[in-house]
From Swiss-Prot:
Similarity comment text for this entry: Belongs to the peptidase S26B family.
Keyword tRNA-binding among UniProt keywords: no
PROSITE patterns, alphabetized: SPASE_I_1 (PS00501)
Organism of this sequence: Aspergillus oryzae (strain ATCC 42149 / RIB 40)
Catalytic function, reaction form: Cleavage of hydrophobic, N-terminal signal or leader sequences from secreted and periplasmic proteins
Subcellular location(s) of the protein: Endoplasmic reticulum membrane
Spans within the Lumenal topological domain: 40-191
Gene Ontology CC annotations of this record: signal peptidase complex
Protein name listed in UniProt: Signal peptidase complex catalytic subunit sec11
Domain notes from UniProt: The C-terminal short (CTS) helix is essential for catalytic activity. It may be accommodated as a transmembrane helix in the thinned membrane environment of the complex, similarly to the signal peptide in the complex substrates.
Spans through the membrane: 19-39
């Protein structure tokens, strides 16, 4: 009887240790993500290209690394932005910059790279698109605000690595299957 209790306690301890190990892995990944977010000053320091609008520069499934510590965006720079009211990041190139305007009556002029006025307003366009992105912006928005809409500027990429993310979002059953396999592996792991 005593051996039965000790084996059950051992199983409970082992199961608890596995659950704690799994929680440690999850919390470590979360802390690394948040640390990277603070380091890059971007809410999403790594994004996946979801469409072909930036071909040939980036293909669908490319993994992009972002940096958001630059005070201004230059024409030709590739930025990632979120449209107000939507949660899908868009990767496009800056085609024009404008100084920030205070009123509708003030005329907006394009600024040069040597201008001391910060270029906080941006117009973007996908390399593979015919027109600029004004149609993609929120209703009534004619340009992006550098501080409010931009997630970050692209500083590096790894081709095709992000395609796994696209597959998981397009086939939800695959996500469930992978989570089930990972959970089963954690539970069956013996030290």
């Amino acid at each position: 009887m005593l051996s039965f209790l000790s084996s059950n306690l051992s199983n409970v301890r082992q199961s608890l240790a596995q659950v704690l190990n799994f929680a440690l892995v999850l919390s470590t990944a979360f802390m690394m993500w948040k640390g990277l977010s603070v380091f890059t000053a971007s809410s999403s320091p790594v994004v996946v290209v979801l469409s072909g609008s930036m071909e040939p520069a980036f293909q669908r499934g490319d993994l992009l690394f972002l940096w958001n510590r630059s005070p201004r965006a230059e024409v030709g720079e590739i930025v990632v932005y979120n449209v107000r009211g939507k949660d899908i990041p868009i990767v496009h190139r800056v085609v024009r910059t404008f100084p920030e305007i205070e009123g509708k009556t003030k005329k907006v002029k394009e600024i040069s790279e040597s201008s001391p006025i910060p270029n906080n307003m941006l117009l973007t366009k996908g390399d593979n698109n015919v027109a600029d992105d004004v149609e993609l912006y929120a209703r009534g928005q004619d340009y992006l605000n550098r501080e409010e809409d931009i997630v970050g500027s692209v500083r590096g990429y790894i081709p095709m690595v992000g395609y796994v993310t696209i597959l998981l979002s397009e086939y939800p059953w695959l996500k469930t299957a992978l989570l089930g396999i990972m959970g089963l592996m954690v539970m069956l792991q013996r030290e």
